Amino acid sequence: MSKAVVVFSGGQDSTTCLIQALTQFDEVHAITFDYGQRHNEEIEVAKALASQLRIASHKVMDVSLLNELAISALTRDDIPVSHELMENGLPNTFVPGRNILFLTLAGIYAYQLGANSVITGVCETDFSGYPDCRDQFVRAMETALCLGMDKQINLLTPLMWLNKAETWALADKYHSLTLVKELTLTCYNGIIGQGCGDCPACHLRQKGLDDYLNHKPSVMASLEQKTHGKSA
């Protein structure tokens, strides 16, 4: 029996990954991390979607220690989300160490479940400048997990080379465009669905949706080319 663990935030990307995983694996589990993020609605959205999609299990893990260590606009209510980069060239929504911690814990959870695959929705094509969304980082983490636990743990990144329009196309391919559009939470200001329309996450999400809806045939063709027409 094939098993997978999806790192699941309830946002567009991880929800699309979860929907795809349900077509690829016999047993799909999700893990959501409560790190004291700016909006707790994210946790509730993830719970609701996990229930609606009828996955094998959904674990919510308290990692509030990350909030103590990582100062970011996503972990502090008194730091407004900025469209400008910080002095180090990163957006102020970057949470240092977040994906290092998330992938490590998801790998440990997969080990306990007897799962060989951990799926994460990080993307290098349309990424927001986060260094822990790069393929190079994910491959390094995969090597570390395999060596550290003496077990093959595959870190799968279905969206890594897709742009946001192609990610919308992927959701549509699995007949879930409306679900992802209306029920997921990507907005940095905690507004479900279309979001606030002003934060960087909303801009990227809406631009991708507009691009997909205005150029459906070409975007779907591009998606198929990148995925070689496979569902896996």
Curated annotation (Swiss-Prot):
The keyword Zinc applies. Keywords: ATP-binding, Ligase, Metal-binding, Nucleotide-binding, Queuosine biosynthesis, Zinc. Pathway: Purine metabolism; 7-cyano-7-deazaguanine biosynthesis. Its cofactor is Zn(2+). It catalyses: 7-carboxy-7-deazaguanine + NH4(+) + ATP = 7-cyano-7-deazaguanine + ADP + phosphate + H2O + H(+). It comes from the Bacteria. One of its GO terms (molecular function) is zinc ion binding. ATP binds at residues 8-18. InterPro entries: QueC (IPR018317), Rossmann-like_a/b/a_fold (IPR014729). Binds 1 zinc ion per subunit. The keyword Metal-binding applies. HAMAP family: QueC. This is 7-cyano-7-deazaguanine synthase. It comes from Shewanella denitrificans (strain OS217 / ATCC BAA-1090 / DSM 15013).
